[in-house]
Amino acid sequence: MTTLTLNTSLLSSRRILAAFSGGLDSTVLLHQLVLWRERHPDVTLRAIHIHHGLSPHADSWVRHCETVCERWQVPLVVERVTLADNGLGIEAHAREARYRAFAQTLLPGEVLATAQHLDDQCETFLLALKRGSGPAGLSAMGERSPFAGTLLLRPLLRETRKTLEQWAVRHGLCWIEDESNQDDAYDRNFLRLRALPLLQQRWPHFPAAVARSATLCAEQERLLDELLASDLTDCITAEGTLRLSPLMSMSDVRRAAILRRWLAMRNAPMPSRDALERIWQEVALARDDASPCLRFGDHEIRRYQSQLWWIKSVAGQHETTVAWPVWQTPLALPAGLGTVQLVPGGELRRPREEESVSIRFKAPGVLHIVGRNGGRKLKKIWQEQGIPPWRRDTTPLLFYGETLIAAAGVFVTREGAAEDKEGVSLVWHA
């Protein structure tokens, strides 16, 4: 029986989606998973190929992958992605698009298997070192990682590229060669083509030693997670915001570790030391009457009520009006704010036949809301209800004609209150 080189202890799941580029590494991975399936007939195996459109050979690569999967009786999903310039660089953007496609393709109960190996681990470590990363970044890749509500497995992570080549030759496998892999303008290619061969010539076991260092860094991070668990419980609210008061008495090092872990929990990119310092100085310690904001790509960190918030950047909609001619059907909101709909059963009256329905994001004058005596301006209501400033001109306001009826999830006006049991509710799916 052929001895598999992949780490079969990872393969407890019986439903596997294999990332399959058609290159050497993923071909060996898929071949070994096919052999694994032969030994375990209850295993369901699929493959996914990402068509980036970056190479003139991309279509022929799809045909190659289809041929291989047909021969091995593996259902293949081909996903075409479009790469736009978002400032990340082509490598990072291609990876982001690739993993987004993986997440969208995974079925319930399915795990993702990718073909990274020991040499890839070494490259990842050195790239993190070049960026000045700490232990978290230097932990590189784990054999098992959370991903899209399931797991990402790297069963070949302990094997060298040479081992995979030997397997492929011994079993007569065919694979494609991506011409971009020979372009040392890319950092990872530079390491693989130029730097690592020199290092391995001097120290043959260099990749294995680097992998051990990555493992030690990962262990240190897990230890820190354990030691800081009670701090995180004290600092993080049920809404996922970060309380500032417990951080004030912490050492700089401890506070930075808490900030990093909070951002990781919000799926934010790992911040540099300079970024952490800016978060603390420019946002956390800003004047009490300020509304500080620090942008990170398409997200931002803000302070409100002595808490830090990690939020998606959304342009204010202060001047926007969205007509809702058929209020019985859901309405799409601008700027990625989601949808609203009026559903039967609730405390809002239905619109009268002569009343037009619209969604707006500002309301002038003095307002009277249900459950409160006296009138207030909208700004005062937002403050009383604890609505953060950045949500005040992105929260949908329901109007019948020129009359404000309700703010989604916040309040109902007296003019909008239902007088019978035929009321409706304004539901906002953000």
From Swiss-Prot:
GO terms for biological process: tRNA modification. Keywords: ATP-binding, Cytoplasm, Ligase, Nucleotide-binding, tRNA processing. It comes from Salmonella typhimurium (strain LT2 / SGSC1412 / ATCC 700720). The keyword Transmembrane does not apply. Ligates lysine onto the cytidine present at position 34 of the AUA codon-specific tRNA(Ile) that contains the anticodon CAU, in an ATP-dependent manner. Cytidine is converted to lysidine, thus changing the amino acid specificity of the tRNA from methionine to isoleucine. ATP binds at S21, G22, G23, L24, D25, S26. It catalyses: cytidine(34) in tRNA(Ile2) + L-lysine + ATP = lysidine(34) in tRNA(Ile2) + AMP + diphosphate + H(+). This is tRNA(Ile)-lysidine synthase. The N-terminal region contains the highly conserved SGGXDS motif, predicted to be a P-loop motif involved in ATP binding. It comes from the Bacteria. PANTHER family: TRNA(ILE)-LYSIDINE SYNTHASE-RELATED. InterPro entries: Lysidine-tRNA-synth_C, Rossmann-like_a/b/a_fold, TilS/TtcA_N, tRNA_Ile_lys_synt, tRNA_Ile_lys_synt_N, tRNA_Ile_lys_synt_subst-bd. Its EC number is 6.3.4.19. GO terms for cellular component: cytoplasm.
